[in-house]
Amino acid sequence: MTKIKLLILAVVMAVSSMPIFSAVVQGQELATTPLAKPKVIFFDVNETLLDLNNVSKSIATALDGREDLVPYWFTTMLHYSLVANVTGQYNSFVEIGIASLEMIAKQKNIALTSQQARTAVLTPFRDLAPHKDVVKGLKQLRALGYTLITLTNSSDAGIAAQLKNANLAQYFDGSLTVQNLATFKPDLKVYHWAQQQMNIAPQDAMLIAAHA
């Protein structure tokens, strides 16, 4: 499903007063409850709002043009973020990405300095363009009066730079990051914490996320 379809789905689900699905068990239709309009819509940022192609190109370049290693780097970064959740040894998402890149370069006998790895990860992550349908979708949601909040594994400084460089800051009412919580999504405590920060019940929230 494309990003804009997900955004439109959020609008349709939120404003509709009709059930969006029904279930049939042993020939009997089950009662459904209409979805309530959310008070807050949380947005994942990387991939959902921002195009990661520049990151992929930068990582491939750092790994001697090995585009086939980019998915390995990304899954390695995600793996160690989950390990950090379990062990309680938090490092920023970017730092994990840098360490993962250095590790893969060493595994594949690719010459890469620590500074080169840092530049390859940090520079493109801070300067990502939004997907072409994102601004239109955000404008539609703003026009409908929704409170829009980013919820990201990035640091406070990271999300501030990303939204500024992508010209998206104007569409959001605030940003929440895992920096102070020191726990990465998709740990359930992140979503509970975000709900508490906005002082809303779970049924009053909606999360928009699209991961390839």
Regions found by a protein language model. Name each.
Residues 2-11, 18-43:
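Non-catalytic pre-domain segments flanking phosphatase-related domains
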Residues 30-78:
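Active-site neighborhood of HAD-like aspartate-dependent phosphohydrolases
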Residues 56, 70, 74, 94-102, ...:
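An amphipathic alpha-helix signature
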Residues 81-119:
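A metal-dependent, Asp-based hydrolase signature
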Residues 96, 129, 133, 154-155, ...:
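Short beta->alpha linker loops
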Residues 149, 156-206:
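Substrate-recognition "cap/lid" segment bordering the active-site pocket of phosphatases
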